[in-house]
């Protein structure tokens, strides 16, 4: 292995050959040498002899902080070395800048990335990368693809709690070599979570923000024991009223990682995380024209008219309602194994399962005619940028009680209806990648990506 060698507290002055051999001329009989190698702890050695000195074999200890299994499995690109347009966000940056924003919004300052909250509800953010929608962006957590196997995209509300367990987040913009069969024409996003690298300790925190935003979080980690075991636990709850009118939300998130460093060549880890949540929404189909937004100023008082939700109202029992509503829970469990075969070759394998259960509601509008069974494309809140005023109270809220009364009085079934789209799926996958080096400039990758 090539080590970096320097005088203590000085710039590097020598690099060893591939076998670790080096010759160094010193101007003083006393010196402190410092040895560095990626993935190992730095080591210092004092030299006080004159003449030629053979230091023998110098052994470096593994450093769990920089040689985590998920980093190798996820294939993080190296700045100024990997030939791709890449941006890496450290956990300190995420913690400092994220605040009460949605997780994808942390990428707003990344070149070529456009992030928006869409309707403005919890977890409804979306990302475009170099003009491509999420269906053409590969999103991975610890190297495991998260994109839906049918339509290619993903819903960030299912992973809203990832911001609390992210060790680093990296975006690669544009086409590039990929180890997974996920759509990545626009680029890829790789999220690496906490693992064996965590220091021993824990914390409890509470945060609050505008519009009833609350977040309670706890985290504890054992650090790596002398036997090579490490355990990290995290749990939390986020709830609030939402910035947009009628977008209340409540979400839990949990994370568990159990890791074992068997020896210098083998390491295994088990990871489980999820974020069960529900949130009311403002449909992106309820957007108004500029004239329409100005017309709702009277409904919002001193608040911005753009916070108005055309389908916000109250049910027959006084409960808050919105035509669009989402509830979902999609936990993921994975078992990772990292095998460092030799100095040039490695094999990383991940087996995973993800189980999704939930649904979403949406308003479907009027029937076509008295004898029809289908509903025309007229949404509850608005139609073609114009606010629906047929079922509107004087304060601007949507009159759900009038719809209940109308449907109850109808002799031909419900005149206005809401649909519930149910999504239940079980994902199973196996991802294995073999890597080896041929000389200093050629890397070979091969493997399998199985998903069912």
What is the predicted function of each stretch?
Residues 10-21:
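Short, acidic Ser/Thr/Gly-rich low-complexity loop/linker segments typical of extracellular
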Residues 3-11:
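Short, small-residue-biased leader/transition segments that mark boundaries at the very start
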Residues 23-25, 126, 145-173, 192:
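Short acidic/polar hinge/loop motifs at secondary-structure boundaries
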Residues 160-205:
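A beta-strand signature from Gram-negative outer-membrane beta-barrel systems
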Residues 104-145, 161, 167:
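Extracytoplasmic beta-strand/coil segments of soluble accessory domains associated
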Residues 201, 208-239, 244-282, 333-337, ...:
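Transmembrane beta-barrel wall of Gram-negative outer-membrane proteins
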Residues 7-8, 34-41, 50-96, 134:
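Short, acidic, small-residue-rich periplasmic hinge/interaction motif at the N-terminus
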Residues 259, 267-334, 361-419:
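Acidic/polar loop-and-plug regions of large Gram-negative outer-membrane beta-barrel proteins
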């Amino acid at each position: 292995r090539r080590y970096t060698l320097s005088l203590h507290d000085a710039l590097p002055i020598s690099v060893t050959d591939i076998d670790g051999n080096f010759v160094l001329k010193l101007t003083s009989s006393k010196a402190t040498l410092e040895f560095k190698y990626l993935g190992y702890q730095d080591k210092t050695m004092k030299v006080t002899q004159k003449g030629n000195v053979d230091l023998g074999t110098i052994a470096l200890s593994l450093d769990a902080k920089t040689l985590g299994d998920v980093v190798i499995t996820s294939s993080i690109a190296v700045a100024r070395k990997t030939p791709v347009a890449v941006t890496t966000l450290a956990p300190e940056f995420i913690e400092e800048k994220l605040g009460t924003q949605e997780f994808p919004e942390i990428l707003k300052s990344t070149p070529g990335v456009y992030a928006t909250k869409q309707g403005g509800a919890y977890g409804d953010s979306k990302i475009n990368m170099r003009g491509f929608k999420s269906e053409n962006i590969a999103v991975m957590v610890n190297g495991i693809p998260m994109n839906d196997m049918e339509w290619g995209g993903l819903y960030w509300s299912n992973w809203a709690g990832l911001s609390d367990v992210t060790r680093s987040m990296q975006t690669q913009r544009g086409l590039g070599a990929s180890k997974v069969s996920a759509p990545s024409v626009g680029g890829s996003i790789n999220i690496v979570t906490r693992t064996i690298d965590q220091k021993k300790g824990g914390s409890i925190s509470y945060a609050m923000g505008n519009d009833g935003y609350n977040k309670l979080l706890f985290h504890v980690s054992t650090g790596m024991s002398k036997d090579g075991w490490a355990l990290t636990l995290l749990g939390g709850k986020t709830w609030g009223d939402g910035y947009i009118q009628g977008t209340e939300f409540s979400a839990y998130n949990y994370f568990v990682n159990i890791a074992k460093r068997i020896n210098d060549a083998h390491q295994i880890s088990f990871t489980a995380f999820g974020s069960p949540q529900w949130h009311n929404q403002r449909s992106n189909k309820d957007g108004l024209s500029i004239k329409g937004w100005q017309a709702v100023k009277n409904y919002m008082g001193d608040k911005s008219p753009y916070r108005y939700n055309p389908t916000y109202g109250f049910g027959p029992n006084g409960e808050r309602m919105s035509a669009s509503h989402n509830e979902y829970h999609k936990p993921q469990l994975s078992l990772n194994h990292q095998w460092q075969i030799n100095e040039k070759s490695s094999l990383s394998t991940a087996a995973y399962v993800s189980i999704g259960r939930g649904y979403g509601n949406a308003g479907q509008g009027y029937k076509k005619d008295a004898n029809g069974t289908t509903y025309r494309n007229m949404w509850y809140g608005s139609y073609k940028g114009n606010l629906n005023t047929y079922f509107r109270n004087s304060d601007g809220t949507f009159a759900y009680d009038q719809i209940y009364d109308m449907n109850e009085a109808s002799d031909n079934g419900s005149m206005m209806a809401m649909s519930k789209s149910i999504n239940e799926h079980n994902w199973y996958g196996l991802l294995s990648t073999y890597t080896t080096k041929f000389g200093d400039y050629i890397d070979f990758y091969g493997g399998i990506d199985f998903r069912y």
